[in-house]
């Protein structure tokens, strides 16, 4: 006989789908008057949304239909897509508690890595953010900057050994992925994944690196989980997924989840033991006890009461959340910078000159201090402009917890010809916020908004941009989101990028090869060397420069 739990899931799923279809086609929605692109009756706009080159479709939608657009998902379920600054402020800042990040009781990320900061809501999120804010402070970044330099020097040595005296085609994206994982490991967890002397064989590191590539093979998994998550408990959902024999990627995702949980638990226990032995024991660990998890654990152990502490489940979840949130986003941002520098050799040479001069001032063999590094104008301009035009995440999602009204900065023309100044959202409506679209809005940034021009950051920004009050946490940009749910580690990520560029550019030149590079849209944008390939890869011609 079939497993009773599967029968219950099938019945619940069928009933839920019937209700959705009934509700969609018999009840008129306030979103019906918004402009919208063509969609299919069953899948809606999902084929375009999950397509690997969907960034082209998003640009078309943004330019054609404006800053408030109706999209559809399965069975005509309606969604709002917006990149209007006032709407984003309302959703991310003013009424953030009424727009939870989760679309259900849990989603596939919490199912596989636990209730970390990215996925916590309400009081749980506020408590976690309160504990984590101090460990991402500027003072903490100064403490770990030498760790970043140490990893960067190892990378420089490894690349020199590979290229020798001649230029070589190297998978730069692969090296950036290994390096950012090691930086996150040492400065974040006090753990080393990679010695750069050979291919990595660390099971924890391999699990972390595999998480997003595997989840990319099951793009509809999150929709399946979200559809049923409000109706069945987490333990039952995991049991159902274990029975997904025809879907090997789902089973692999479960194994990856188990490896991450097991290794995180072991690392946490080792750190707790070292903390109990005192500072001398911490000094001998990777990160010397100044890594983020050691600082967090120490603060947590010294909390005034047990009720104020983070429980072990949440501490474990922070580890995988921290790595997964920072690894591909930072490594692919670095890859994008190096790709753009290879396309613009004049910019590369100008930046190399600034970085070489900064290193000469502090003296050979010494690190450029944190406070000097973050003030280098052209380095900052290159990083800002790349993150403006190519944010690692193109979109973020929210859900209306109740009937809401979203104001717009400027009206859009409705399908009935009237001007729409605000959008009424029925409860449970899913909202997609266009981060890249806001960053490249010509009304705010000018006609050259789609051009990569680092020099724009060396002069006053457009007055329209200042007046729009974009709610981003970083430089009038939405690249790291905004409000209390903005990226807590954006300065950490910037420091990683700037340290690596400071070491790599004076040491190597980067040129394009004969093969084109394709950038693909996924949970995080990633490069491939073939338009049909799913393997993250970016070949550049790398040549060692005279020391």
Swiss-Prot record:
Null mutant phenotype: Leads to a significant decrease in the titer of the 4 ganoderic acids Mk, T, S and Me.
Pfam (any one): p450
Molecular function terms from GO: heme binding; iron ion binding; monooxygenase activity; oxidoreductase activity, acting on paired donors, with incorporation or reduction of molecular oxygen
Transmembrane region(s): 2-22
Pathway stated in the Swiss-Prot or TrEMBL entry: Secondary metabolite biosynthesis; terpenoid biosynthesis
Binding site for heme: 487
Induction data: Expression is induced in ganoderic acid (GA) producing conditions.
Cellular component GO terms held in the UniProt record: membrane
Entry's Gene Ontology BP terms: terpenoid biosynthetic process
Main location, first listed in the record: membrane
E.C. no: 1.-.-.-
Function: Cytochrome P450 monooxygenase that is involved in the biosynthesis of ganoderic acids (GA), a group of highly oxygenated lanostane-type triterpenoids which well recognized as a main group of unique bioactive compounds in the medicinal mushroom Ganoderma lucidum.
Name of the featured protein: Ganoderic acid synthetase CYP5150L8
Species assigned in the record: Ganoderma lucidum (Ling zhi medicinal fungus)
Gene: CYP5150L8
């Amino acid at each position: 006989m079939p497993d009773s739990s599967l029968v219950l899931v099938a019945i619940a799923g069928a009933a839920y789908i019937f209700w959705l279809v009934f509700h969609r086609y018999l009840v008129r929605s306030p979103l019906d008057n918004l402009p919208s692109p063509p969609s299919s009756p069953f899948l809606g706009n999902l084929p375009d949304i999950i397509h690997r080159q969907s960034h082209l479709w998003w640009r078309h939608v943004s330019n054609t239909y404006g800053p408030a657009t109706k999209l559809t998902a399965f069975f005509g379920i309606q969604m709002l897509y917006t990149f209007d600054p006032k709407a984003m402020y309302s959703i991310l800042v003013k009424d953030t508690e009424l727009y939870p990040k989760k679309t259900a009781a849990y989603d596939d990320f919490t199912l596989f890595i636990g209730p970390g900061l990215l996925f916590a809501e309400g009081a749980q999120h506020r408590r976690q953010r309160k504990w984590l804010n101090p460990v991402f402070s500027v003072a903490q970044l100064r403490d770990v900057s030498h760790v970043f330099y140490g990893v960067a020097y190892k990378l420089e040595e490894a690349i020199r050994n590979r290229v020798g005296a001649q230029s070589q085609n190297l998978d730069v994206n692969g090296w950036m992925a290994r390096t950012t994982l090691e930086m996150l490991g040492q400065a974040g967890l006090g753990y080393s994944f990679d010695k750069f002397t050979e291919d990595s064989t660390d099971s924890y590191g391999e699990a972390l690196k595999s998480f997003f590539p595997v989840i990319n093979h099951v793009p509809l998994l999150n929709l399946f989980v979200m559809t049923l998550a409000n109706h069945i408990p987490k333990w039952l959902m995991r049991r159902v997924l274990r029975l997904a024999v025809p879907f090997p990627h789902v089973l692999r995702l479960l194994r990856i989840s188990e490896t991450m949980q097991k290794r995180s638990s072991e690392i946490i226990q080792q750190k707790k033991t070292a903390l109990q032995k005192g500072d001398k024991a911490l000094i001998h660990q990777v990160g010397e006890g100044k890594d983020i998890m050691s600082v967090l654990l120490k603060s947590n152990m010294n909390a005034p009461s047990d009720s104020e502490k983070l429980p072990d489940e949440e501490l474990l979840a922070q580890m995988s959340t921290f790595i997964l949130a920072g690894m591909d986003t930072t490594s692919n941002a670095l890859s994008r910078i190096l790709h753009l520098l290879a396309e613009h050799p004049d910019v590369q040479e100008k930046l190399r000159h600034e970085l070489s001069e900064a290193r000469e001032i502090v003296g050979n063999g010494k690190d450029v201090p944190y406070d000097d590094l973050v003030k280098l104008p052209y380095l900052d301009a290159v990083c800002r402009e790349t993150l403006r035009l190519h944010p690692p995440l193109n979109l973020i999602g929210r859900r209306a917890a109740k009937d809401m009204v979203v104001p717009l900065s400027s009206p859009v023309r409705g399908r009935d010809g009237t001007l729409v100044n605000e959008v009424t959202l029925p409860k449970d409506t899913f909202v997609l916020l266009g981060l890249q679209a806001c960053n490249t809005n010509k009304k705010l940034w000018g006609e050259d908004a789609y051009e990569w021009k680092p020099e724009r950051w060396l002069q006053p920004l457009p007055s329209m941009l200042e007046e729009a009050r974009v709610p981003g946490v970083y430089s009038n940009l939405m690249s790291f989101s905004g409000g209390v749910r903005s990226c807590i580690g954006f300065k950490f990520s910037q420091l990683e990028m700037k340290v690596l560029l400071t070491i790599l550019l004076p040491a190597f030149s980067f040129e394009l090869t004969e093969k084109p590079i394709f950038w693909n849209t996924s949970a995080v944008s990633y490069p491939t060397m073939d338009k049909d390939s799913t393997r993250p890869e970016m070949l550049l011609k790398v040549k060692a420069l005279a020391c």
